[in-house]
Amino acid sequence: MLSIIAGFAALIWSADKFVEGAAATARQLGMSPLLIGLTVVALGTSAPEILVSIMAAMDGHAGLAAGNAIGSNIANIGLVLAITALIAPLPVKNSLILREIPLLVAITLLAGWCLLDLHLGLVDGILLLSGLAITLYLLFRWQKPPLAAENQQLADNEADEIPDIPLARALAILLVGLTVLLVSARALVWGATEIALLFGVSDLVIGLTVVAIGTSLPELAASVASALKGHHDIALGNIVGSNIFNLLAVLAMPGLIAPTHFETEILLRDYASMLALTLLLAAMAWLALRRGGIGRYSGGILFACYSAYYVALYFTL
């Protein structure tokens, strides 16, 4: 348990430093602030989940890696987004309805297709990573004109968030963050697998619960803090982006490193719950265009569904 707590704490701290160092390095190398925000920062914020999945797969615990990806998406919608909506209504932009959310639904269906045979292999991993490359391209293209004025404002906002520090210092922060990320991910995986052995549950269940919630804590803290400050309009976009990267980058790792077979529960219970929550979010976002946002009532429904999933998980252990 101590290893898990220390691993989570170090993971959250090092992920922040890794993103800071990577963004500052990219800025010094001439990348535009907008491109940094769409690639370096977006992928960097998923670094904890990616590193944990890599370490778990390398240790032969592919179930923990897959559970982390699916469980994090369930927690992002049913816990993080729900609590944020309970604090303040979440505005929904037209672009999110027309582009990012349909993309998330399509990627969720792609992940389901990869899991349909209860096997996650090399071909599945390559397919998911190819989807990641296409997604990054689409995200970049979608920020092009005719939304030039909006893009400039977004670029200015990104520039304000990226530290302007010397290249040598940026590289040092990047290396320190990456090193601590690797060590803390290793400690977290070790602690999680030990708990699985202690309680006699599968590493998939630990990935779906302890690890998934733990790696979602930064998103929860950031979303709640933004909502309390009145900046809750970015929360929905962040969750959608995080879920996309979880499925394409995190879920790909066990397929690439340690191809494995799963029990039917991962498809009928866990994936089905993730898909249902994703479709429910899409429906709520579409209805929110007329109602002015995803409000407390919707947040309550999402949290109730999240709680019901954990009840089902408990009774199917």
What are these regions (language model features)?
Residues 1-317:
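Hydrophobic alpha-helical segments, chiefly the membrane-spanning helices
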